[in-house]
């Protein structure tokens, strides 16, 4: 057996290692100073932009990538072409940016530093969104509208509940899945300390638009429960005694509803990612992104030692992507005053995960 290769990453204050896929020289990335979250937002965007520009220029393409380790088990690694190297390095840089940013923001005195320092409501929400796989020793915090249904399929295949990810069955989002909230405190502590922990993020406004189009355009239960209430609250001139189906909520009405909602009590499909997964309270080993879903998911499957035949599902043919043009169109239909009230509710999702704030100026929206 060849000697085990060195692991790469940065050590947290607790001594644990944040894993990356390849080494990068110290001159590649500069340290960011810790500042309060409101100021950090813009500093992160500027710093991230410079690093990603370096990636686009191909400055790091020659760095070699070691195979990920998988909890000490032998893994039949998927074959990787040489063209994957640049993508691996780019992903590593994105991880480095996110980890430095998270450490800066989460180092503030008023931020939670463990699961047990959260309020009962915050802890309940978090533990109900973390899925457990004991065989491969990992925890996955799922975020609705960030490919979580496909990840649940993968977990069911790994546990033997499904033969493969392509089986055409209606997804039951609770059956055959183990949630961290199902376990007693001592077992929760053990898994948080010893298991590989990951989550996936998405551009916050694209995630909201995806939820809006899906839930209010296709799901009758959401139209009745939320759509009808939104119309009663925010639509001018509607007759109070008129029966409302809730299937024609506008995106502006939806944003007004979000502005008035408490982020900690929102429906999970539009609750901020920060509130769902609490990245300050849990030290995630890997934070993947929807924008790099295929490569990041492939890395996770290798990292946890998934069998060769287990793969991440392809997107369904009926899937309607949120393109930049589509997002631009919808955001520009919302009055500026509502967006200015909405964005602060998701400011930690933008700043922690390195997403720039959307440009919705009048000049930009003319195009």
Swiss-Prot record:
Keywords: Carbohydrate metabolism, Glycoprotein, Golgi apparatus, Membrane, Signal-anchor, Transferase, Transmembrane, Transmembrane helix. The keyword Transmembrane applies. Its EC number is 2.8.2.-. The keyword Transferase applies. InterPro entries: Carb_sulfotrans_8-10, Sulfotransferase. Residues 56-367 are lumenal. Glycans are attached at residues 99, 359. GO terms for cellular component: Golgi membrane. 3'-phosphoadenylyl sulfate binds at residues 144-150, 202-210. It is a single-pass type II membrane protein. Catalyzes the transfer of sulfate to position 4 of the N-acetylgalactosamine (GalNAc) residue of dermatan sulfate. This is Carbohydrate sulfotransferase 14. It comes from Danio rerio (Zebrafish). The gene is chst14.
């Amino acid at each position: 057996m060849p000697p085990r290769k060195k692991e790469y990453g940065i050590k947290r204050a607790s001594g644990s290692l944040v894993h990356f896929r390849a080494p990068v020289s110290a001159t590649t990335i500069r340290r960011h100073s810790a500042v309060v979250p409101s100021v950090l937002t813009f500093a992160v965007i500027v710093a991230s932009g410079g690093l990603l520009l370096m990636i686009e220029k191909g400055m790091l393409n020659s760095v070699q990538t070691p195979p990920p380790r998988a909890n000490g088990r032998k893994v039949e690694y998927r074959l990787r072409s040489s063209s994957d190297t640049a993508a691996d390095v780019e992903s590593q840089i994105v991880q480095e940016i996110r980890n430095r940013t998270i450490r800066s923001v989460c180092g503030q005195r008023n931020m939670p530093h463990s699961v047990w320092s959260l309020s009962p409501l915050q802890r309940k929400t978090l533990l109900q969104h973390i899925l457990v796989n004991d065989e491969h020793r990992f925890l996955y915090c799922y975020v609705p509208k960030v490919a979580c249904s496909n990840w649940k399929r993968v977990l069911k295949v790994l546990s033997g509940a499904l033969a493969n990810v392509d089986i055409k069955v209606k997804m039951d989002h609770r059956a055959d899945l183990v949630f961290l909230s199902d376990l007693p405190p001592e077992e929760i502590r053990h898994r948080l300390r010893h298991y590989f922990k990951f989550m996936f993020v998405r551009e916050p406004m694209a995630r909201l638009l995806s939820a809006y189009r899906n839930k209010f355009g296709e799901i009758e239960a959401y139209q009745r429960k939320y759509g009808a209430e939104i119309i009663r609250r925010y639509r001018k001139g509607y007759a109070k005694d008129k029966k409302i189906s809730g299937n024609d909520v506008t995106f502006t009405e939806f944003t007004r509803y979000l502005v008035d909602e408490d982020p900690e009590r929102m429906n999970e499909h539009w609750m901020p990612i920060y509130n769902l997964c609490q990245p300050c309270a849990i030290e995630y080993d890997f934070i993947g992104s929807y924008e790099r879903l295929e490569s990041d998911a492939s890395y996770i499957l290798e990292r946890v030692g998934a069998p060769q035949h287990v793969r991440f599902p392809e997107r369904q043919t009926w899937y309607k992507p949120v393109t930049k043009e589509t997002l631009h169109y919808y955001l520009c239909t919302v009055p500026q005053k509502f967006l200015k009230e909405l964005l602060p509710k998701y400011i930690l999702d933008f700043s922690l995960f390195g997403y720039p704030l959307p440009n919705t100026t009048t000049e930009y929206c003319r195009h």
